[in-house]
């Protein structure tokens, strides 16, 4: 039998020289010493041992979720060009003996792997024709309920000057087409590894040079440990609302790249000690709240909602500032001081939720009538002006507006939906009681508890689908958020206008998370995002400038926090239908 790793050249001394240069000699020796008559799984195990390679599985428990039958598509990044296919196939065959691997034609030339590997030609000028048979075989295998491992980039990763890192080439829409057609379950896997600097330098000269050097990158891995991070199964229903094949492919790439981010992303927690109000002051706090009866907006079971000016709050404003810091620090934000207060507090109203049973501040908003603040303190008197650059033309464009910000729900009350609902009923009362105002605006944060990948995804999706374009020339962030590694296309961004789908992908980036609650709430009110700012003094939280013109909010939504009577009055004042 002809050794498939040897060059069929004459004279033989030239072939031997080239085999040594390109690393084929080592591979040839390994092949000559192979055990005969073994199945693909045993052959792969032999090759891995002979190469001196080991591997580590992270989140190995996710492999147990692989369905034993039915169409399954495994996707992975392609940093090495050969070794990852061998190691992954060896692991995956334990769970799906019916596995097929879509790989380059060079690996398929090995007789022992013909049953396992489906080859595609990445070198020939007539690749599209020669690849047809391989792609057809993959379609047939998935149609019959088989499992397929595919590297959607199609080629080994390259050094990208723009991002200053080695990363996959754009993923091909083929995987999206396969999922859409066969409703496959998908398993994302991230491979951590890289080839030599010479390899990437050669690729920058010409892609064919990179391909020629692939055998050496396989043969020089003695002692190399390959880390594989196994993602969670993605059921076809999860991406049912994503219709475009390229958008589906991008969704899978983000899910795969996120597996690398999971081990790299660490939220920055504050370390200073917070000094709470002494317990013996609770009764004094209760007394001061009772003195605010004229500012009470809502009574509901154990909660009351108040909106009062700073100079009437005394101990209450101190407790609000402490609760702010506790809440923000709990999600990786915060000022780092014992309480979160600033020079803006004194000329804003403070809307707060009071737990009259446990004598605690359950949540709060800072509220300011824009025209009043600007007439007294100028544009710089608005808190948002400390985060975004704008002038009077922005204020004029807003119209009759109320600035809202510094909102929080204390951690003890975050699992109770009534907390946010009551605060928003309070906001509804403010709007109805001040009929000249119709627009709410202010900053809403995405904390450092979210990974860089998730934060960039949120920024791109929201600015693509929910941008306040009429304000684009009037406001800009003081410190813009920079997306370091954009791996998605415009097609995916437009498909993720569905907030539910966006939330699921964020959960892939950061397990257990979704789009922040307040952002979801504002978008449900037909809110738009003007821009995002990085708040360096607030532990680098990401601050989106949200603008909500309540005149275009769905009537059903407005009724929920204004009440039927208040909503009717609001509609009449602003001459709205609905």
What are these regions (language model features)?
Residues 132-277, 488-496:
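Non-catalytic C-terminal accessory region of glycerolipid acyltransferases
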Residues 1-78, 85-87, 94-98, 114:
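Membrane-anchoring hydrophobic helices of lipid-metabolizing enzymes
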Residues 297-350, 354, 360-363:
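Short amphipathic alpha-helix that is part of the acyltransferase structural core
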Residues 343-352, 514, 539-544:
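A short helix-loop-beta-strand connector motif used in the catalytic cores of GNAT acetyltransferases and
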Residues 325, 335-338, 370-528, 533-543, ...:
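Acyl-donor binding region in acyl/amide transferases
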Residues 271-311:
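Conserved N-terminal entry element of GNAT/NAT acetyltransferase domains
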């Amino acid at each position: 039998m002809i050794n498939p790793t040897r060059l069929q050249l004459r004279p033989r001394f030239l072939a031997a020289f080239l085999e040594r240069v390109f690393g084929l000699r080592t591979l040839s020796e390994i092949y000559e010493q192979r055990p005969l008559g073994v199945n693909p799984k045993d052959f792969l195990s032999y090759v891995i041992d002979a190469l001196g390679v080991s591997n580590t599985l992270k989140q190995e428990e996710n492999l147990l979720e692989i369905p034993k039958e039915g169409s399954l598509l495994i996707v992975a990044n392609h940093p090495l060009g050969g070794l990852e296919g061998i190691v992954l196939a060896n692991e995956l065959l334990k769970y799906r003996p019916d596995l097929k691997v879509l790989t380059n034609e060079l690996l398929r030339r090995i007789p022992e792997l013909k049953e396992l590997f489906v080859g595609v030609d990445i070198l020939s000028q007539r690749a599209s024709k020669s690849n047809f048979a391989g792609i057809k075989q993959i379609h047939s295998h998935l149609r019959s309920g088989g499992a397929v491992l595919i590297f959607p980039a199609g080629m080994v990763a390259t050094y990208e000057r723009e991002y200053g890192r080695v990363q996959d080439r754009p993923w091909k829409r083929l995987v999206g087409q396969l999922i859409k057609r066969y409703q496959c379950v998908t398993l994302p896997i991230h491979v951590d590894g890289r080839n030599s600097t010479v390899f990437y330098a050669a690729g920058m000269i010409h892609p064919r040079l990179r391909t020629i050097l692939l055998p050496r990158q396989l043969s020089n891995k003695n002692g190399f440990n390959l880390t594989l991070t196994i993602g969670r199964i993605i059921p076809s229903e999860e991406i049912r609302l994503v219709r475009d094949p390229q958008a589906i492919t991008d969704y899978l790439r983000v899910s795969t790249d996120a597996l690398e981010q999971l081990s790299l992303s660490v939220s920055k927690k504050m370390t200073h000690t917070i000094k709470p109000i002494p317990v013996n002051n609770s009764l004094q706090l209760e007394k001061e709240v009772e003195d605010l009866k004229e500012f009470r907006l809502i009574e509901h079971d154990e909660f009351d909602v108040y909106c009062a000016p700073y100079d009437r709050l005394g101990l209450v404003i101190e407790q609000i500032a402490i609760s702010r810091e506790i809440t923000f620090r709990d999600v990786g934000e915060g000022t780092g001081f014992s309480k979160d207060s600033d020079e803006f507090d004194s000329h804003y109203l403070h809307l707060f939720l009071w737990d009259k049973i446990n004598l605690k501040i359950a949540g709060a908003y800072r509220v300011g009538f824009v025209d009043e603040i600007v007439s007294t303190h100028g544009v710089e008197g608005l808190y948002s002006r400390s985060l975004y650059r704008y002038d009077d033309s922005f204020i004029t464009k807003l119209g009759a507006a109320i600035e809202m910000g510094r909102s929080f729900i204390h951690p003890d009350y975050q699992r109770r939906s009534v907390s946010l609902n009551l605060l928003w009923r309070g906001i509804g009362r403010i709007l109805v009681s001040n009929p000249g105002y119709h627009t709410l605006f202010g900053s809403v944060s995405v904390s450092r508890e979210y990974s860089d990948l998730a934060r960039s995804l949120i920024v791109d999706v929201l600015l693509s689908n929910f941008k306040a374009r009429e304000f684009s020339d009037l406001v800009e962030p003081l410190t813009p958020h920079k997306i370091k590694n954009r791996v998605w296309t415009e097609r995916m961004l437009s498909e993720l206008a569905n907030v539910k789908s966006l939330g699921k992908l964020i959960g892939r980036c950061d397990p257990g998370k979704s789009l922040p609650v307040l952002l979801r709430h504002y978008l449900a009110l037909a809110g738009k995002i003007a821009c995002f700012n990085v708040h360096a003094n607030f532990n680098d939280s990401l601050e989106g400038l949200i603008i909500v013109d309540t005149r275009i909010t769905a009537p059903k939504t407005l009724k929920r926090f204004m009440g039927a009577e208040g909503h009717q009055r609001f509609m009449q004042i602003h001459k709205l239908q609905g």
